[in-house]
Amino acid sequence: MFLGFLLTLTLGGAGILPAADEEPPPEDPLEAALRIAYEGRKRIQEAIRDYTCILTRRERVDGRQMGYETIFVKVRHPLEEQGRVVQPFSVYVRFLRPDRVKGREVIYVEGRNGGKLIVRNGGTRFAHITTSLLPDSPAAMQHTRYPITEIGVLNLTKRLIENGEQERGNENCEAKLVQGAKINGRSCTVVQVAHKVRGEGLAYKTARILIDDELVVPVHYSAYDWPQTEGGKLVLLEEYTYTDLRLNVGLTDRDFDHRNESYLFLKSYSP
């Protein structure tokens, strides 16, 4: 009798146990986005030594909407051996547009040059001036929201993970995942996170992240504030798009040296 009861439960005759082929509940969009971001961070740290790309950005700085800037970027990730840094985090950028900053070059090598940037002014006035600046100094931060030390897809991935983990369990936060988007012809997954109600300390109303499906790295991030008027449009806070990503191109110390013959820094400058 008892054995027959067990068989009834096992076969689902009593309606207690689910069918073996019943589909699991869909993954929470925020958790799915975090899972993708964790995978991306692991891939970047383990498989991507360096890369070049084009960064297109647009930001609101001190309440003022800045125009689009297009920047050629070289990044080399840090490398440690036996607990010692043998290759520091390194960045080189050259501004391509607009004209007011065209030709500006910046180099940053973590732990070198007194922790300072080496900057060639570029643009239409005093273009050839070469100087050193702290990354977070007022002069370096004059027209941007973040220091150059935070540039790149790895830093963007880390920031997305940090923000996503903070939103876990937040009932004021809605997330959704959309497949099939394209950036520069490449297939991407869209992660959108939105806050339903304005609250103190919220950095944005809506954020959109596009993750390259093949590379598993974020290639676009944009964040919007609440409308300034009832029924108005969302206000852009920041927008960053990485295109033409070329991975593991073999960047060397020379790529992050202002004396490189292909750069326009003052070669005699001593930081």
What residue spans do the PLM features occupy?
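Bacterial N-terminal signal peptides
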Residues: 2-13
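Boundary at the C-terminal end of the N-terminal hydrophobic targeting segment
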Residues: 19-21
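Gly/Pro-enriched, hydrophobic low-complexity segments
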Residues: 60-62, 97-99, 107, 113-270
